[in-house]
Amino acid sequence: MEFLLSNLVAYIAREMPELILVDEDYGQLENLDDDGQQMYPLTTPAVLIEPSRVDWSHLEGNSQKGEATLRVRLIIDCYDDTHAGSGTEFSIKDREELRHKLHSLLEGYRPLDDGGLMRTQSTFFTYKHGIKVYESIYTCTVTEQMRQGTSYRSTQIRLSMK
C-alpha cells in the first residue's frame, strides 16, 4: 500500500498548494494533546491519508488483484465566528470549496495503472480545538506483481454423478 500512499501524497501536495501539510495518517490528529508522543506538529489545513486495507484475490500467473480502501481526511481549523451576521460566514463556504476541490482531485484519479479512486463514504465532524474533519473513504483496484518464479495455478474441481 505504500506505493499508493507515496503517489497520493505527492499528487495532492502538487495540486493543492494551499495545504500546509499532506502526509500519511499515523495518528497526528488523535495525539494533539499527548505531549509524551513524539510526532511532528499537525498544521492546518492538512490532508492525512491512511491506506487501511486491501482485499486480495488470486489471478493466473505472477500477479494478484485487490480492492484497496483508503481513508482521506481534510483537517481545517475553524476559529472564525460563523454565526449569522458575524461577517465571517464566508468561512463555511471556503471550507466547503476546499473539501470539494480535494474530492474533485481524487474521484476517478488513477494512482497506478489500475482502477480509479471511487468515494464510497463521507463523514464530517468537529474535533477538539475547533478543528473540522472532512473524512472520505475511497476504493480502487490495485495489482501487485509477484517475484519471478512465483505463480498461481487455478484449481479445477471435478464432480462425477452416479
Sequence positions of predicted segments:
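Short structured motifs
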Residues: 33-35, 55-56, 86, 118-124
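Charge-rich, low-complexity terminal tails
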Residues: 139-162
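Extracellular/virion structural assembly segments
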Residues: 63-67, 77-104
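Small/polar-rich, solvent-exposed N-terminal microdomains that initiate assembly or binding
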Residues: 1-62, 154-162
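Generic secondary-structure microfeatures
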Residues: 51-55, 72-78, 106
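Acidic-leaning, charged glycine-interspersed low-complexity segments
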Residues: 18-21, 42-47, 91-147
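Oligomerization/assembly interface segments of phage tail-like spikes and tubes
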Residues: 64-81, 132-145
